[in-house]
Amino acid sequence: MNKKKNAPVRKIIADNRKARFNYEILDNLEAGLVLQGAEVKSLRSNHANIAESYASFENGELWLVNSYIPEYTQANRFNHEPRRLRKLLISKREMARFFNATSREGMTLVPLKLYFNERGRAKLEIALARGKKLHDKRETEKKRDWGREKARLLKRYG
């Protein structure tokens, strides 16, 4: 008999839930990260914060700015700077496409998830996004509340 293949295991380290509320997500992309050894060990112990971070282009390269990976406690002298710039690895075609998109006004690159893929590599899901206005945020909240209320009513009255 054929065995069913399970979905790939992705161990999520950090999730930027605030980004989906503050930004309108237009396009997603998976990028690799250039990390030091102590950073990987710190990530494996689920310590990271990408809530206030963003991606920017400098000298034709894509960098993750203001992400926080704390120092690994057992790595005494080989530790890293917790808020250092981290290079993101994407193809040249994707880099050109995202560079052209972010050069338009109001567009930015925000990280959504930081995770280990099925091969054990640290990956970052980044999104091309446009900032929401206050009325857009209120509309999103109303839709979410109505969805919850609708589910409650369906559960109650079948």
From Swiss-Prot:
InterPro entries found in the cross-reference section: SmpB, SsrA-bd_prot, SsrA-bd_prot_CS
UniProt-listed CDD domains: SmpB
NCBIfam families: PRK05422.1 (NF003843), smpB (TIGR00086)
Keyword RNA-binding: yes
Family: Belongs to the SmpB family.
Assigned keywords, A-Z: Cytoplasm, RNA-binding
Official protein name in the record: SsrA-binding protein
Taxonomic path: Bacteria, Pseudomonadati, Pseudomonadota, Alphaproteobacteria, Hyphomicrobiales
Superkingdom of the organism of origin: Bacteria
HAMAP family in the record: SmpB (MF_00023)
Reported function: Required for rescue of stalled ribosomes mediated by trans-translation. Binds to transfer-messenger RNA (tmRNA), required for stable association of tmRNA with ribosomes. tmRNA and SmpB together mimic tRNA shape, replacing the anticodon stem-loop with SmpB. tmRNA is encoded by the ssrA gene; the 2 termini fold to resemble tRNA(Ala) and it encodes a 'tag peptide', a short internal open reading frame. During trans-translation Ala-aminoacylated tmRNA acts like a tRNA, entering the A-site of stalled ribosomes, displacing the stalled mRNA.
Short name of any one Pfam family annotated for the protein: SmpB
Disulfide bonding pattern of the chain: none
